[in-house]
Amino acid sequence: MTNNALRYRPPGLYRESDKNRYTPLSLPDTGIPGFVGITERGPTNRPQKVTSYEHFLRLFGNLNLDSYLAPAVQGYFTNGGRHCYVVRVANLSGLASGKGARHGGALLKNASGKTAVQITAQSEGSWANDLRVTFRALPPRTQTLLTMDLKPGATSASIRSTHGFKRGTVVQFEDDDKKAHVSLSKVDSKQIFWNEPLDVEFRSDGPTLLEPIEFEIEIRLGENREKFSNLSRSPASGSYFARVINERSEWVKILDLLPEELPNNRLPAEALKSPLSGGRDGVDSLTPSDFIGDDRGPGERYGLKAFEFIHEIDLLCIPDLMWCLGHTMGFRTEKHVEIVQHEMVGQAERCRDRIAILELPEKSDYKDALGWRTLFDSSYGALYFPWLEIERDGVLQRVPPSGHVAGIISRTDEEIGAHAPPANQDIRGVVDVSQPLSPDDAGMLNGDCVNAVRPMNARGIRVWGARTLSSDPMLRYINVQRVLATLVRALRRDLQWVVFEPNVPALWKIITRDITLFLTQLWRDGMFRGNTPEDAFYVKCNAETNSEEERDAGRVVVEIGVSPVRPAEYIVFRMRQELEKPDLD
């Protein structure tokens, strides 16, 4: 109903239908990788969105190993990456044998010798063994005096001022020879109330001093620290120490083991002056299963499988497979690396919206690269060779190329689009490659669908290939596969409104119209070949694609054909020399 129609109707309540319930189709963000690997700390097996390398270090720390996840993430952002997802893996099944990952922690006792507080690191790892936690009493922010005597059994008191007192405040009563503590349940005018009766007497002419008891907790990790002030011992307080720490600390969790005790018994007798202990990394016992993970349903998806339902991800990278080979008991041969890489490609094939970026072990040579390529035949994977040399903290380190390649893909998508081949692009933050390749070497690798990385003299070090691992010529190029994957993601996201609509010709026409408009714009943007839209794509959604059988099964079927642009891999010069013709005259 239009606003003009309402002008000519009497006042009342009218229903206005909205026929534009669907969202116009648009391209999703692309070039978003999911990384799986080893970190110093951070949530285990739970994907974390990371927006910069500094953000990565804040979440996951800086592992004191020559592993490859951190330099891969750094290389991704250095080369133009926008954001990514990271899953930290550790072996969690080896706790009984003493080899699995474990949280560091400590148990603290109060003045009575009872265990009062349990401190546990937020995540597994030996990093927690360097944590120091200090409980420190604070001087009172306010003080007041008792104005009426208190007898044993009292549950309320009249005081000179209630400024600085509120529900949950732990209050100390003190005269010349004794102290008592209560947790306030109510504050009203110049009266305070509590639940547990006092067992001693306090006189107003004592005098009896009242003050709120607060403290602070300081947590140190190296030169960094977290500090939480004005904390309360009472669970009824908004500043209850366990609640504040558990909601705001990035490093530890605290459990109050004596919540029913009197407030003065809930805290440690003195500051913890030694580090937490017992933290283990669980890295030496990593297996392929730890990287692959498991899918036990929502909230229980681990490792690589945790990415399967994050549809924003369109690249997969696991550079730490190469570190595990030779460093962990579960990766004794290259076959174990191959198992995980096959699962990467398998996930990409199941989701149809991502590509696995693969690499070889460090000491592989040219022939090894050609042999590794034969292990795969899929347009959902791409293989890069050789490794890169980077400088970290003044030391040269060789790293797998997947993180840097993911950054180049993200940069190319941002500057041009997913239809542009992510090749002939300079790799930033790299000083050399592990093995130099001649033009003939690179050509041979390219012919066998291995993407070479080559120094190009003054043009820097560049990715010199854009091929998938498919033997199908139609799906040979990365940009072709990524165009198709991007379309899948766009259609999956923006056609959700179709679900439960009446499956009738009117719906088919709307779907055909919207997809045609969308693909026409992509053709204008250079994503498809063809001089006209008819040459570039077609959309079919009619009675032919939606038979009675399909409709009875609750399906609406749309057939789409596109012709993505392909890269120019070779530049051919044809030169002809003409001899001067003799002058017969």
Where are these regions (language model features)?
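Short, cationic low-complexity segments
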Residues: 141-144, 238-242, 580-585
